[in-house]
Amino acid sequence: MSKYKTIIFDLDGTLADTSEGIYNCIRHAQKMMNLPPITDAQMRSHIGPPMHESYERNFHLSGQDLEKVIGYHKEYALTKGLFEASMYEGMSELLSQLKQRGYKLAVATLKYEETAQRMLTFLNVAQYFDVICGALADVKLSKSQLLGKCMSFCGSDEASSLLVGDSSYDALGAKEAGIDFLGVTYGFGFTNQQEVDEFPNVGCAETVNEIGRILS
């Protein structure tokens, strides 16, 4: 796959297991706003989609209440949640190898950009990325728009860019942005190749090491 110049990674469920921090962000927001409990499946469904969509769907919030709950979520994320994450086994080594092979590396995440930057710095991998693009407080960006920002910063076009991600949101974002998609099944979204194959893709990786083999 030497045609690629820029490899863009999703964060949650692709680069790192961020579930503990995300779940604790939700619990903090629930406590602060006295929200009812939700099921484990509903909790897990918060990983991947835009934050406001998850709170709208699972807690039926809107307007000022929605803004308040997102504020509490972000409050926990920036003070504690960003430290409650761990890189998937082999990912740090993969990023180092890809960088040495001359790829430009980027992150496109619906997580708040400040949180993502601080988290990846804490995990000691921020230095591998040319750009980290995430959600902004005053601007709602779709996955495809974030991918466009990454490509623009890295000076690459659609034909030379690839997104690695673990969910249908990633696959649809790549399709909308006009770039290739590599699905992974070790994260929170896809669980097998059949699910990945429901979307246009150039491959499916069950482990981090398989990403490296596919890109070699």
Whereabouts are the PLM-identified features?
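Acidic, Mg2+-coordinating phosphoryl-transfer loop and its flanking beta/alpha structural elements
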Residues: 163-203
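A short, structured active-site edge motif that brings together acidic residues
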Residues: 126-141
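Surface-exposed amphipathic alpha-helices with a cationic face
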Residues: 92-99, 171-175
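Conserved H-loop
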Residues: 36, 125-130, 157
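N-terminal helical cap/lid subdomain that shapes the substrate entry/recognition surface
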Residues: 2-93, 101, 114
